[in-house]
Amino acid sequence: MEDFLLSNGYQLGKTIGEGTYSKVKEAFSKKHQRKVAIKIIDKIRGPEEFIQRFLPRELQIVQTLDHKNIIQVYEMLESTDGKIYLVMELAEGGDVFDCVLNGGPLPESQVKALFRQMVEAIRYCHGCGVAHRDLKCENALLQGFNLKLTDFGFAKMLPKSHRELSQTFCGSTAYAAPEVLQGIPHDSKKGDIWSMGVVLYVMLCASLPFDDTDIPKMLWQQQKGVSFPPHLDISSECQDLLKRLLETDMTLRPSIEEVSRHPWLAST
């Protein structure tokens, strides 16, 4: 692996992330003269559904997206031993999860600045006909004051002719919309909106809005609605947006265009 990457001009560094069938390593690119991140996907270790269905989608989608709030893919390489290497932009500030884990709840003004960028990224994706389907704090990377989305491993191109309804469970339980958890045919874009609500809540409260250790209990909590720790003094406009994002009825949940026009995001 190291020899293959060296021959392509990349000096491997430390591991900065690990998934089920992949890992992400820091590297130095001689070609770009800067640090990069390399996602290494092992096709041999992955199950057939992942190799035949999800991986080709990810590779197709990441090469078409181009937005300042989405991690850029510079190059894709494949070695003879069944490994795929995605050479990507490196966000050196870590992810939102670690930021909140180490520092606690973020100030509302900082959360607004970051969340606006997530809204812009998802607005772009949905406009391109792409649903991310795995939005979570770990997939929101930080580069200074900039937020950049990554990991399109569960992403899907949506048909333009009619509204897409999916029954596939993707992503992480804690961030999954109730219709996804229940296996109800659903609109993947509306699933992204719910997940954004969970990310927003975590940034503000440094905790999950619902208990993900017990799925039936979590579904009951979701129906009851989200509550806010009073000591954090979250503004009424922000609470209103969160309640709209975490609307259990997906037909009432706003589109990304409607989210972008919400008063909380419009105000300075």
Label each region the model flagged.
Residues E75-L77:
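A short, aromatic-enriched beta-strand patch in the conserved N-lobe beta-sheet
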Residues I40-L65:
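Conserved N-lobe beta3->alphaC-helix segment of eukaryotic protein kinase catalytic domains
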Residues K23-I44:
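Glycine-rich ATP phosphate-binding loop
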Residues L114-F115:
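Activation segment signature within eukaryotic-like protein kinase domains
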Residues G13-G19, V24:
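Protein kinase glycine-rich loop
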Residues G82-D95:
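Conserved short submotifs of the Hanks-type protein kinase catalytic core
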